[in-house]
Amino acid sequence: MTDHEAIQRAIDSFATSYNSGDLSGLLAYYDDGLIKVRQGAPAESKAETERRVREVFARFETRVDVDNVEIEVSGDMAYTRGVFVVTVTPRDGGETQKLTRRYLEIWRKRAGEWRVARTMDNTER
């Protein structure tokens, strides 16, 4: 399997984990030194991401659809860029919402495994 294919497989696994509410599977996508920057929010670590996503999974039925525009690999570093659509439905009733976001992720390969080390996203207008 090429590095490009391995990264695409990791992205597909991320979406499967997110869509099934599998927090452990979702967190496996990220490097332990993760720094995540989201629009309008402070940067967060992997532990902070875990707390936030745990709360989201508890409160909402979730779905993510990812469209990769670009995957580029250079040695043990890579980046991906694309668009994802998150759909959330409150578990206690309420209106389903969709949010379209553009993302950029920086990947690091360690011990043969690709993980996201840095990620940022913003709302598409």
Place the predicted regions along the sequence by residue.
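A solvent-exposed, acidic/Ser-Thr-rich amphipathic alpha-helical stretch
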Residues: H4-A10, S20-S74, V83, E95-L99
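Amphipathic alpha-helical repeat scaffolds
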Residues: D12-A15
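Short beta-strand edge/turn micro-motifs at domain boundaries
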Residues: T100-R125
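A short, structured loop/turn motif at beta-sheet edges
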Residues: I71-A78, W107-E113
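Generic short beta-strand segments
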Residues: V83-T89
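Flexible, membrane-facing loop/turn or short amphipathic-helix motifs
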Residues: R91-G93
